Amino acid sequence: MGDSRASKEYWESLWREEKLPPAVNPRDHSLKNEVVLKFDSLFRQVFAAERRPPDETNLLELGCARSAWLPYFSKEFGFCVTGIDYSPVGCDQARTILAMEGVEGNVTLADISSAPQHLLNRFSSVVSFGVVEHFEATDEALRSCGAFLKPGGTMVTVIPNMNGFVGRLQKWLGREVYDLHVPLDAKALRRAHEVAGLEVLRCEYFCFLNFGVLNLNRIRQSFLGLWLSRALNAISAATWMLERIRVRLPANRMTSPYVICVSTKTT
């Protein structure tokens, strides 16, 4: 799988300082929750086809540190949820969020590339948010991710679009964060899945704009940086308001904050 550009120590230094995120709530229709609502719509499309018996319908989140999504997948789709992460701090925080939401789930402390054998070829669904783009060999990382899927299982890979405007801003405002990513466009992400032996069902840019994906922790320490951060968030919110009044703002290579890939394991 190769080495990650982002170390465990880097992530834990961030997580110790930040408040736990609230669990994802698709019933909050406020504008600040717009990106969650977009992802909720995506997942309802992807998982609507799930027709397995309840005792076989399970989901694994890769890189589940302080996951706000595990309770969502349990409550909204009835998945038996499991998470895996290599950070003790991140795993403990994920367990805390599950407990706060009253959701049963398993969180395993392990590296994705050397996971316990009982987790392999086990899951009907696998998801990851911002994981595979940290590895130089994307196809090898995806091959390790796909090893958790049962034959016929579905995997959803979400990464930030570091090839577009968001990536350029991150490079300018926080080069040290940008350098932790391998910039991948939709074509490269699709190809990496195919090389990893997965069948791609869809691979595309997702959401028109969301500057909230930027990591601006360093510049927020200054008044100017805080002002810029708030201005960028206001611009994002303005585009979401336009979309709510039926102005069509399609996802695209330049402005979209995410690239998503939905794939399946055929054998």
Where are these regions (language model features)?
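Short, glycine-/aromatic-enriched active-site segment of Class I SAM-dependent methyltransferases
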Residues: 158-180
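Short conserved AdoMet
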Residues: 74, 136, 150
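Conserved N-terminal segment of class I S-adenosyl-L-methionine
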Residues: 1-121, 125, 129, 142, ...
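Short alpha-helix
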Residues: 181-197
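A C-terminal cap/extension of S-adenosyl-L-methionine-dependent methyltransferases
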Residues: 170, 202-267
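A short glycine-rich, Lys/Arg-flanked "PGG" loop and its adjoining helix->strand segment in the class I
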Residues: 139-151
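A short His-aromatic
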Residues: 130-134
